[in-house]
Amino acid sequence: MSKRPGDIIISTPGSKVRRRLNFDSPYRNRATAPTVHVTNRKRAWVNRPMYRKPTMYRMYRSPDIPRGCEGPCKVQSFEQRDDVKHLGICKVISDVTRGPGLTHRVGKRFCIKSIYILGKIWLDETIKKQNHTNNVIFYLLRDRRPYGNAPQDFGQIFNMFDNEPSTATIKNDLRDRFQVLRKFHATVVGGPYGMKEQALVKRFYRLNHHVTYNHQEAGKYENHTENALLLYMACTHASNPVYATLKIRIYFYDSIGN
């Protein structure tokens, strides 16, 4: 006959075991449900139905489709290898061509709900042997009033101290036009000892960024009329460049007002 566990602590130099006292019948507690320990409070309500969740999770949940838009969710990918310099480079993320497919926009207006930046930054074979540290700084910008055939250069938008990209801020006369939505960085190290020749970049941001085009069908910067989405990249080392192999995906919805 098995003994009933007692509420005692058996402590040895190697282990400490706590046993719980149980006054119920041994036949009643033979089949017990497994206990799931949840460390994060938010995850405790993920698999519950909506009517079983607290009021906070029902009132303040973000909608799947942005307001004023309609499905399905469309995807546009930008895949390119860039040479990131100290002076900075720019990529237009909101270039979407007009068409009937799942990678096209239906009309003039659409909303970029989220963006996924995936890839790596890496050093060349000759550069990685030099003893140095290089940081690549990414700026995700909103251009509220696009103008011209191409976006402005890094130095025309940002005000820097001693031409250092890590101190870059939007110029005072351009603050109403350009807005920094997200900023992040990645680091690579060259040299014979603590070499880190490549660094992974993996970022996912929710933006709800509304873009407006003109009557043209081509997805170009010159056809934007409102809210172009730009990605600026610059490295902190003055002489050694960094290569960036990135895949940028935007998830967008067409506007109802088209």
UniProtKB/Swiss-Prot annotation:
Biological processes, Gene Ontology terms: symbiont entry into host cell; viral penetration into host nucleus
Q: What is its main location?
A: virion
Q: Does the keyword Ribonucleoprotein apply?
A: no
Q: Does the keyword Transcription apply?
A: no
Zn finger (unnamed) start-end: 69-86
Q: Which UniProt keywords apply?
A: Capsid protein, DNA-binding, Host nucleus, Host-virus interaction, Metal-binding, T=1 icosahedral capsid protein, Viral penetration into host nucleus, Virion, Virus entry into host cell, Zinc, Zinc-finger
- Provide one Gene Ontology cellular component: host cell
Q: Where is this motif: Bipartite nuclear localization signal?
A: 3-20, 202-249
Name under which the protein is recorded: Capsid protein
Native organism taxonomy: Viruses, Monodnaviria, Shotokuvirae, Cressdnaviricota, Repensiviricetes
